Amino acid sequence: MALAHATYRRLLGPTWSPVAPERLRRAVGGKVVLVTGASSGIGEATSELLGRNGAHVLLAARRGEVLDEVAGRIRAAGGEASAYAVDLTDLDAVDRLVHDSLADHGRVDVVVSNAGKSIHRSLADTTERFHDVTRTNALNYLGPVRLLMGLLPQMRERGSGHVVDVNSLNVDLPAANWAVYTASKSAFDAWLACIAPEVRVDGVATTSIHFPLVHTPMSAPTYDPALPALTVDAAAQVVGRVLVTRPRLLIPWWVRLAAPVQAAAPEVSDAVTARFLRRKDR
């Protein structure tokens, strides 16, 4: 399995490979980096990676006791970390996070917007569960927007900063049974794309990473762990790389090829998917 995961990562190409540690230390050393969804998965691995490389990591997630454990590991390894228990669906709590992080540290240099809710459910199974739509949008779109609206002004005033959006290739290749999730992730991706030129004028970079499958606790209920995918540590290395290279967008090369085909012939794509779903339901 490890060989399959390593091969998968190599197939993504050099822009998805780990960056040299000394380059990462130069990019994040001494900076205050806020990571949402830091209690598990990509957020946890990213927080530990950045902590090892000189960043003061602000860990944000709902589970305060787990955040304390992550912060403890970062400190034990010689890094700096502060934990903030917050539910990003609670906009008042998001405002408190903005206030407390700036009051405690004076600034936030980088935001890694990683927290998210994945939901794999058909339209039929969602019809009586509209709360799935509202909660998923609250966590994947509204909460991150509120957070950045609070933190971007101080970045723009200083003339520096970086926002990294940990997103999904579902944004580029919409798939059946992923409507609620994909719509929420696409909304934040579009919002960030729209503000990117506005904040770039003031020295603030934005990066959207459209990840392929990553084996995380969030993906575990849906995907077989034997499927080739990125590990959370490999995904964290990708986040580390974009903090150095600062691209506007990072997506797998094969998505760049497939997305135009799907856009040019959506009827064909829909027909193939519908045929697959009919077979699956038999």
Spans of features found by a protein language model:
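Non-catalytic terminal and boundary segments that flank Rossmann-like NAD(P)-dependent oxidoreductase
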Residues: 1-29, 273-282
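Active-site helix of classical SDR
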Residues: 148, 184
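The beta1-alpha1 cofactor-binding region of Rossmann-like NAD(H)/NADP(H)-dependent oxidoreductases
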Residues: 64, 84-97
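Conserved glycine-rich cofactor-binding loop
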Residues: 39-40
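C-terminal helical subdomain
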Residues: 208, 224-263
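Conserved glycine-rich Rossmann-like NAD(P)H-binding loop of the short-chain dehydrogenase/reductase
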Residues: 53-70
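Conserved mid-core segment of classical short-chain dehydrogenase/reductases
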Residues: 118-134, 177
